[in-house]
Amino acid sequence: MTIVTNLGFPRIGARRELKRALESHWRGETDATQLQHTARELRARHWRLQRDAGVDLPPSNDFSLYDHVLDTAFLFDAIPQRYHGLVDADPLAGYFAMARGRQADNIDLHALEMTKWFDTNYHYLVPELHRDQHFALRGNKPIAEFEEALALGITTRPVLLGPVSFLLLSKTVDGSNRLDLLERLLPVYTQLLRQLQESGAEWVQIDEPTLVLDLDAQTQQAFRKAYATLNQGPRPKLLLTSYFGPLGDNLELALQLPADGLHIDLVRGTEQLDAVLNTLPAGRVLSAGLVNGRNIWRTALDNALTLARYAQGRVDKDHLWLAPSCSLLHVPVDLEQEKNLDADVRNWLAFAKQKLSELRVLADALDNKPEAETALTQTRQALEARRQSPKVHRPDVAQRLAALTPDTTRRNTAYPQRSQAQQHTLNLPAYPTTTIGSFPQTLEVREARAQFKSGKLSESDYEAFLKAETERCVRTQEEIGLDVLVHGEFERNDMVEYFGEQLDGFIFTKLGWVQSYGSRCVKPPIIYGDVVRPAPMTVTWSAYAQSLTDKPMKGMLTGPVTMLQWSFVRDDQERAQTCRQIALALRDEVQDLEKAGIKVIQIDEPAIREGLPLRRGEWADYLNWAVESFRIASSNVHDTTQIHTHMCYSEFNDIIEAVAALDADVISIETSRSRMELLDAFVKFRYPNAIGPGVYDIHSPRVPQEEEMVLLLKKARAVLPPEQLWVNPDCGLKTRGWKETRAALQTMVHAAQRLRAE
């Protein structure tokens, strides 16, 4: 019988039960016991769901209260000194302080840095290490969760982040080489593997996703050393797991490592199958990632079955396992909950539960079970209906794309001339202050939106409520003394969803939530067809907000690359083509904002770096169309209109030329967690336009001291001309409360005023 396995399951629950439990605990409404009870219930539910879907070997230790990389650091006692006292007194509180920061009871701790998990929309906490780092087992989470499943009658495969990837995903605070710590880390892994074996685990999934990256000789040697060491002690069988791309030139290395099985991504790396089969050692299990763990489209089962049958004929009997390409963490839980979705589009989709069923169908087909044919036929019919659907293809969009020229992507004049025209129009002080866009989405705002959507609040009453919130936001900013204002975005549920709801070619689920980080969940739009803007999307609210103040009001848009990256994107055409379609829709919106008197327009591109292919050799093509798309959206304005953009979590050294090529008049970037380290790229490159380095971390409720912000601004001023500098938070303020927001922004304005006075 063909084995069906899974690499990971969504943690949050089909109805975001984990999010609610976490936030209740953080508010002090529930204690740790109640939180852990919810966590146990979710794990049990998910294991049973996988078993019932036909998964023979589901994972354990894929669950996390916040983040699996943080879990790994915590498990191995890689806890920075500043958290030791709290962790020793209350481990769970210390764990959450590492994730979120903590400012209470005379404790003032900032959080670990957060960044994107490879090129996905999930975020992980970056472990902080140093040259004298000590590792030791703290707790027994992987063993406890394996035994928890066993008590339910379900045998699982514990998941561990592998030692080399753990180090490569970490940062050292003293400039030392992360891989030099491998010697100290391996004994702890060896100890853990021995304990898992003693607990009865037959297999352990050891994730080494960095195997799909460009690796230098030192890193390749670290892999050899690590797995030679792990192979010496007693251990369960190891499934060496790669995902997010082909192994490429690391294939030989991966097959040399002494593991008992190898998982490969055959969605993003279909071309690697032959090379793997030609060199797979006898007796080694091949886990074939045939179902896309990152997107929500039904699998072309006939194509997947062809690959599976080909592999089946080349590996030892019972040594072919079927799996998703990666963990299902990145997709919603269950399509069956979507009762009101367009029936045609719904028939083209598969969420986590459905993807597991697809794997069971493939396994049954391989085993020649007749019941598989019905499901295969249904899939063929659904895919053909999608290919032929007029909902997907629009001739007017194709005509507009064909009419694009180089002039479509150019501003009228160069930045030096534009900046003079803008300063003449805007008359801003030195170190101008602004925010990134959103203001706190309070419970009242969320409840009003929910009541409006459910029909309990009339459109006129909802509009009156939003106008009052917008005016309060504008008045608050004026009182604080900000220079360029925003309207607060109270009418928006999400920075992508809000636009997607107003664009043809997008569709939305009701419960299609995926985890972004911690309790933060997003409901990505689904781009199923050609994109068109039927009507203006933001002009009414931006113009209303501008009518309330004499200060400049920013129009706020989400950029084409970010809308693409943060959506589930159609897989029947190149991503670049879909991105250009979105850019043309935004181009029309930018033009309408300018006509309405909006003189500052921000086109957020926080996701531009995460779209980079994992292999450097593929970067140029992506950056070309990403920059082109931004410029399509932003270039049809007068010199006096100031174009801003914003980027998150980015390391800029290797893409700084592309960032400059966007030709935004002002770029704001997230720098506070990295203590302004990210500015180095702009300094070395001599970035010509204006920059707003974030001076405080909005992902934490902590209110920083004025002196901290002044110090960060002085660090920025030491390396960049003062006339280039703007002052702003790291990111939008949607998830923060009003009290801390007002206090932090007032402190930020005071910091800017101090620099102006010097």
Swiss-Prot record:
Q: Name the Gene Ontology biological process terms.
A: methionine biosynthetic process; methylation
Residues engaged in binding L-methionine: I436, G437, S438, E489, D604
* Active site (UniProt): H699
Q: Report which gene this protein is encoded by.
A: metE
Catalytic reaction(s) noted: 5-methyltetrahydropteroyltri-L-glutamate + L-homocysteine = tetrahydropteroyltri-L-glutamate + L-methionine
Per the UniProt record, the source organism is Xylella fastidiosa (strain M12)
What top-level class of enzyme does the UniProt entry assign? Answer: transferase
Name of the protein described by the UniProt record = 5-methyltetrahydropteroyltriglutamate--homocysteine methyltransferase
Record: residues binding L-homocysteine: I436, G437, S438, E489, D604
User: Per its database record, what is this protein's job?
Assistant: Catalyzes the transfer of a methyl group from 5-methyltetrahydrofolate to homocysteine resulting in methionine formation.
Q: Where is the signal peptide?
A: none
Enzyme Commission number: 2.1.1.14
Q: Name one GO molecular function term.
A: 5-methyltetrahydropteroyltriglutamate-homocysteine S-methyltransferase activity
